Amino acid sequence: MAGASSPASLRASRSRRLGKETNRSDLFKKPAVPFAFALILADAILVALIIAYVPYTKIDWDAYMSQVSGFLGGERDYGNLKGDTGPLVYPAGFLYVYSAVQNLTGGEVYPAQILFGVLYIVNLGIVLIIYVKTDVVPWWALSLLCLSKRIHSIFVLRLFNDCFAMTLLHASMALFLYRKWHLGMLVFSGAVSVKMNVLLYAPTLLLLLLKAMNIIGVVSALAGAALVQILVGLPFLITYPVSYIANAFDLGRVFIHFWSVNFKFVPERVFVSKEFAVCLLIAHLFLLVAFANYKWCKHEGGIIGFMRSRHFFLTLPSSLSFSDVSASRIITKEHVVTAMFVGNFIGIVFARSLHYQFYSWYFYSLPYLLWRTPFPTWLRLIMFLGIELCWNVYPSTPSSSGLLLCLHLIILVGLWLAPSVDPYQLKEHPKSQIHKKA
């Protein structure tokens, strides 16, 4: 009869329903889940108090609004979009985001602070989902995610675009944990369009894509991400393409030595030199390759062994689907988060200059990274506190910068010494799941 369900479809539907119910039940059995909700509530109250009683710090808001006003006024030459801090140096996604902010707040600071307070809580919720799903950090240590004075300031007292970029980045990571690779790549590209620091995650993300999907899936995911960049920049690409690309994607900018939080101890003439930048880049790339070969691809026989095992450059999959390369195994959530957080952290350690708002680029990964090291808990907590203190020294000093670099390097050593676990888990057959539920 038309509309009648077959026994097989009924069994599959029952399996999916039971799986969802069990996942919800298991999730709420974890002490981390109610504790995470309590943290969100407590931090929401704290954010409200900060907005109400701590004076706003004027830094980039007026410049943002000036640049947005020029864009809304019809200016499409990126070289002419300027504020009191200089020309616009972010991709066009920044303009769309802050145009929406201006429309919602009228360009006023106080309602913008409320909006950023909501953004802070949304970002915290997404990060807590990542932590709960991976279950690497003990439940009580989730409180560390709410204890940064500098991060609260970046979100609700400074209103930096880093806040939107990192929220989108964390959202893309959450999607990757649910194996929504194509949708996650679209969100990731959206984050890049707000601020390019998100590209620090790109090398490890590419590796994960190669592990998670076949060649067709990888190419289509990358094409989707590229399409986002084209569509976002289209008004500028069809009018003043050279100006847009030169200003929005300038990778050669030299930051002011005075504001450097991480390399203040380096003499200014060395700090601004091309040789120093090249040395940092070489160290960055070397460590990325080393971690990829000996940590992230260890179980596949290193990078070369991994590429050979996939026949990536030699053959296309027999089925032009967007599914995983191997139907019997998937990447563990821990491997996804560890690779992305560590890859980004390597870039942070060897960034020539970290300004105060750049702390948001990796703060939310710190508890996770510390608990991936073999260090005792007391040392992890001391290092977390030490990094937070370094970021709250204003202005930074050679001593605070030197201490920050030392703490970063110790974490890197700990991550290198940590054992490499199998990045794959077996995917159970649906029938075996039905038998388990019965």
UniProtKB/Swiss-Prot annotation:
It comes from the Eukaryota. It holds the Pfam family ALG3. It is an enzyme of class 2 (transferase). The keyword Membrane applies. The chain crosses the membrane at residues 32-52, 78-100, 112-132, 155-177, 196-216, 218-238, 271-291, 330-350, 374-394, 401-421. Pathway: Protein modification; protein glycosylation. Glycans are attached at residues 23, 103. It is a multi-pass membrane protein. InterPro entries: Glycosyltransferase_ALG3. Disruption phenotype: No obvious phenotype under normal and high temperature or salt/osmotic stress conditions. Keywords: Endoplasmic reticulum, Glycoprotein, Glycosyltransferase, Membrane, Transferase, Transmembrane, Transmembrane helix. GO terms for molecular function: alpha-1,3-mannosyltransferase activity; dol-P-Man:Man(5)GlcNAc(2)-PP-Dol alpha-1,3-mannosyltransferase activity. One of its GO terms (cellular component) is endoplasmic reticulum membrane. It is found in: Endoplasmic reticulum membrane. The keyword Transcription regulation does not apply. Its EC number is 2.4.1.258. It catalyses: an alpha-D-Man-(1->2)-alpha-D-Man-(1->2)-alpha-D-Man-(1->3)-[alpha-D-Man-(1->6)]-beta-D-Man-(1->4)-beta-D-GlcNAc-(1->4)-alpha-D-GlcNAc-diphospho-di-trans,poly-cis-dolichol + a di-trans,poly-cis-dolichyl beta-D-mannosyl phosphate = an alpha-D-Man-(1->2)-alpha-D-Man-(1->2)-alpha-D-Man-(1->3)-[alpha-D-Man-(1->3)-alpha-D-Man-(1->6)]-beta-D-Man-(1->4)-beta-D-GlcNAc-(1->4)-alpha-D-GlcNAc-diphospho-di-trans,poly-cis-dolichol + a di-trans,poly-cis-dolichyl phosphate + H(+). GO terms for biological process: protein glycosylation. In the absence of ALG3 activity, the N-glycans transferred to proteins are aberrant, indicating that the oligosaccharyltransferase (OST) complex is substrate-tolerant. Belongs to the glycosyltransferase ALG3 family. Dol-P-Man:Man(5)GlcNAc(2)-PP-Dol alpha-1,3-mannosyltransferase that operates in the biosynthetic pathway of dolichol-linked oligosaccharides, the glycan precursors employed in protein asparagine (N)-glycosylation. The assembly of dolichol-linked oligosaccharides begins on the cytosolic side of the endoplasmic reticulum membrane and finishes in its lumen. The sequential addition of sugars to dolichol pyrophosphate produces dolichol-linked oligosaccharides containing fourteen sugars, including two GlcNAcs, nine mannoses and three glucoses. This is Dol-P-Man:Man(5)GlcNAc(2)-PP-Dol alpha-1,3-mannosyltransferase. It comes from Arabidopsis thaliana. The gene is ALG3.
